[in-house]
């Protein structure tokens, strides 16, 4: 792993959060806090997990470091190398693909000028291909940071990226106005009866 810092320690605020997370688990089961602690370490370290951060988490939990590495390398939510300010994760799993994720991938490639696994020269965007993000009913979709952008087409995907490029904050959720995961055409079965009840 290149570009690794020599040390890692949680800052004071995150050290308190780490203690609170560990305290949620019964004595003898503190290792169960490994995933939230890795997330906390990643957030403190600009979106990626250096080896020293994983070693620090292992020390806090009394785990062999290899067990922490196994978790960090298994889940795609952990980044083992530096990423851009905006991590664009495009779902290409079957439901998104059937609903047009190829067009979303193409729009992202065109707008950002990069491909999967790459970061823009200015360090603003990293683009990743990801497996299912769990919002299949609103496919196709992508995740940027902690936000989901759903019911995408190439135009809406491009608009989201352009807004981020200009420093704006695009509205997460459905890009077609759909309410949560209702059918695309609106409610069909659970409609209010006449009289509003």
Q: Where is each model-derived feature located?
A:
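Signature of N-terminal electron-transfer/Fe-S-associated modules in redox systems
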Residues: 1-197
